[in-house]
Amino acid sequence: MKQLYGVIGNPIGHSLSPLMHNDAFEHLGIDAHYHAFLVEEEMLGEAVKGLKALGVSGINVTTPHKVAIMKYLDEIDPLAKQIGAVNTVVHRNGKLVGYNTDGIGYVRSLQAISKEPLRHKRMLLLGAGGACRAIYCSLVAAGVKEIDIANRTVETAKQLIASSKERVVSKALSLEKATEAQENYDVLIQTTTIGMHPHVQHTPMQIGSLKQGAIVSDIIYNPFETKFLHDAKLSGAIVQNGIDMFVYQGALAFEMWTGMMPDINRMKQLVIRKLGG
């Protein structure tokens, strides 16, 4: 019997997840289908009950349901609980179990382009929203010891840092202070929507002098190269856009559902082609 997987969100028509997962199922010879489900916020509880009743094997969760879905699940993974959001649900032994692969996926994508273990690197995160929280918690879980957070509202960054119970050296900075100190960091990670299409000339921070060999990463992938990444490249940085994070979080969800890891590069090239790259 064909297994059914999917993604729920609103809007959902733009989602690249069905393309990516259905290709992986076919490539690995798995008899399954992945479908995009448009779910209105007020219908989320009913949708989750329906997915469970129909025996859907697993789902991804996207905007605006990542937080709201948690109250409808049977169990939540500790890291997802700490992040405060779920993006992947596994239907296991009659229970719906929630996970968050956004942050872990990002960490794996970052490690893939780093020549050294991430725990040896000093990092700066820009932003303090949901994406930043997922990445921050996952970096801490991966053993990174120095992670500062810069945000327009410094108090929000302080609250995020205070929520972590792990031993990690973190400071909350203004964007102005972060701009002055950017040369001190091995990795700069842009987690906001600043610079996303159509506001492609915007940047959260002016890039100046960077540490030699610095990695500069932006979770945005539309455009492929934000002004932030463009300026970082001109300053000699190794740059990474948001496609890697998107692909790795999807691949981790796929592995949780099937026990098989899909071809990461195949997934990435498929997404790039679809986006016109």
Swiss-Prot record:
Q: Where is shikimate bound in this sequence?
A: S15, L16, S17, T62, N87, D102, Y221
User: What Enzyme Commission number does this protein have?
Assistant: 1.1.1.25
Q: Cross-referenced InterPro entries, in alphabetical order?
A: Aminoacid_DH-like_N_sf, NAD(P)-bd_dom_sf, SDH_C, Shikimate_DH, Shikimate_DH-bd_N, Shikimate_DH_fam, Shikm_DH/Glu-tRNA_Rdtase
Assembly: Homodimer.
Give the UniProt keywords, A-Z: Amino-acid biosynthesis, Aromatic amino acid biosynthesis, NADP, Oxidoreductase
- Would you tell me the protein name for this molecule? Shikimate dehydrogenase (NADP(+))
- Organism phylogeny: Bacteria, Bacillati, Bacillota, Bacilli, Bacillales
Q: Name one GO cellular component term.
A: cytosol
HAMAP family cross-referenced by the UniProt entry: Shikimate_DH_AroE (MF_00222)
GO aspect biological process, one term: shikimate metabolic process
**What top-level class of enzyme does the UniProt entry assign?**
oxidoreductase
